[in-house]
Amino acid sequence: MPINIPVHLPAKQILESENIFVMDETRAFKQDIRPLNIVILNLMPKKIQTETQLLRMLGNSPLQVYFTFLIPSTHTPKNTSREHLDEFYTTFESIRHKKFDGMIITGAPIEHLAFEEVSYWKELQEILDWSKTNVTSTLHICWGAQAGLYHHYGIEKIKLAEKKFGVFEHLVKEKKERLVRGFDELYYVPHSRHTDINTEQLKNTPNLKVLSVSEEAGVCLIVSDDDKQVFLTGHPEYDTDTLKQEYERDLLKDDTVKKPVHYFIEDGDALVPVNRWKAHATLLFMNWLNYYVYQETPYVWE
């Protein structure tokens, strides 16, 4: 996919160096095709890193895609410059009248808070309600998945006794679902979270399908019956070294922090991360974009 991004977005140079096809607005304007419009609600603290990770996942399809980056107006990010936010981001008020083919809601490192304690919770609820009528399919990631399941279905999150941290094996349960088309029966996903969803409540909730699970990490992939809501409890978009960065960050605060499991190999005295999830992660995002967005979205929104 020639992903269509602003000329000066920091991710552009990184993705081009990785041989991922990107185009700027000038070239995209000359192509006479109907592009997809995807809005990304970026709740992660490192905005540029998350932008790059998600655009990398969406950069290998023949479709042209426009991206709109969104932040809550009721929260001021502390780890991204005001200049970057002003140039590349907008708020819900400026887009609420629009229709989008797809939406991605990222995770956020705020699991210790009850949903109602989150500063932008009411705004997020409004966005989630809006997505049901203004977006063809919404992909919720990690905390974003927990928030979406709680808001749409009343499924609560529960605190884990120990952080779920590492790269975990998952089993595909619903092999005929389009979202996992082409998957091996077993695949890997990084997880980094202190909470989980209430699986008993999930079992008793109609209109939701569990597509994959892990013996160690629990439920990973959930889809609504109409394919409009996709919930992903892990972080398949993560770079090879993202868990390593989080581990080193946490070690500075607590030297008893356990290292992520099933992730490092030892090379002498060094711990080297190994990426075992990239191929399936790319396929997951491509399947969502093709089958749940492109194949389902109207050519002209009414």
UniProtKB/Swiss-Prot annotation:
It is an enzyme of class 2 (transferase). SUPFAM superfamilies: Class I glutamine amidotransferase-like (SSF52317). The keyword Transferase applies. The active site is at C142, H235, E237. Its main location: cytoplasm. One of its GO terms (cellular component) is cytoplasm. The keyword Hydrolase does not apply. Pfam families: HTS. It is found in: Cytoplasm. Belongs to the MetA family. This is Homoserine O-acetyltransferase. The lineage of its organism: Bacteria, Bacillati, Bacillota, Bacilli, Bacillales. The gene is metAA.
